[in-house]
Every structure is written in C-alpha cells, then in structure tokens.
Amino acid sequence: MSDAFFQRLRGELHLKEAPATMDGYYGDVFSHLPVLETPRLLLRPLKMSDCQDVFAYCRDPEVARHVLWDAHQTIGQTRAFLRYILRQYRNGEPSSYGIVWKETHQVIGTIGFMWLNTENRSTEIGYSLSRDFWNRGIMTEALQAVIRMAFDTLKLHRVEAQHDTANPASGRVRLKCGMLHEGTLRGRIYNKGQYIDVDIY
C-alpha cells in the first residue's frame, strides 16, 4: 500500500496539519504515547504482534463501511498498516492507540489523532471498532479518555471529530462525550466512489 493510501486513512484533508516529524513536546508525547485506562479498556500503542487481532475486524466490510479505508483482503494489508503506525510512533507524529478489551487482552479497535495543528492547538480524533463490540458503550468510553488526554496532556484548545452522515450512531457517541454538533459539510469527502456529507463536531 502506498503512503498516499495511509494519508487518506488518517484523513489528511486539511490545509494545516502536522509536519512529517513533530519536534519538542508534542513529538515526545506521540513518540511515547501514555497508556490510558478505563473501567473496561486499555488504550496503548499498537504492536506488530497485534496483527491477527487487527486483521480480524479490519477485514469486516461493515467496519470499513463508513471509514476512509477499504476492508482488508489479506493479513499483509494489516501488517502494512501496522508498519505505518509504528513509523508514526518513531517519528513522533499524531497517531492511533490500540483499544484493548481488558477481559481478553484482545485489540478490538483503534482510536487516535488524525492530525494536529500546533499553531491553533487543535486536533481531530477518529476511530474504528470491531462489530462484535458495537452498541456496548465501548467507543464512548474510549473517546472520553482520549479527549481528556488531548486537553490535559497535550494542552489543546480544540478537539474535532467528523463522521459520514449515513452513520448517525457515531454522532451519538460524540454527543455523549460532550462534543457539540457544529454543522454538516456537503460533499466533504470522496470515499468509495462517491462524495459524502459529513457532520462535524
């Protein structure tokens, strides 16, 4: 897979984003992402040994339906994704946590920073989750933890999130976490052969 694919995966559609390598405080944080713990979850950096767990949900077309990447057809695609994430860690770039279900130590999804604007101290959070764990409040739990980290550790001023308007469940997660719906961007993203509207928070 090309770097262009993974840039699209991260949602790099903004005019001002993180440079290839972030220096200083932000780079240090992203190079050594702090583990976040919630009642049911551990949010930790991903590892190559997570490959089978990640492939298990990334191969699901329903999981991929409303995100910017296509369902993985082979485990090699998942390995390429993880190598990309590990490179982001090494470079101190905004990246993703693995969402670990404490009960089984299984990686069931990812959540993290799509980009970070150091001048305006703003970021966007994106996520994906195994279908086996939908409708259980898990993503709300994870998103609350990452929002706290964004404000308390990264000292950011603004945290954004956006989703396909055809996926209202994701909007409900944002609202439960105290985010405010700011509007709808028409034809904002070209994804899977069509332009889609997105709600922004």
Regions found by a protein language model. Give the residues of each.
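Hydrophobic alpha-helical elements and their junctions with loops/disorder across both membrane
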Residues: 70-71, 85, 157, 168
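Conserved GNAT-fold acetyl-CoA-binding loop/helix
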Residues: 62-84, 95-97
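Short loop/turn motifs at secondary-structure junctions and domain boundaries
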Residues: 88-92, 179
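Hydrophobic recognition helices of helix-based DNA-binding modules
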Residues: 85, 89, 150-153
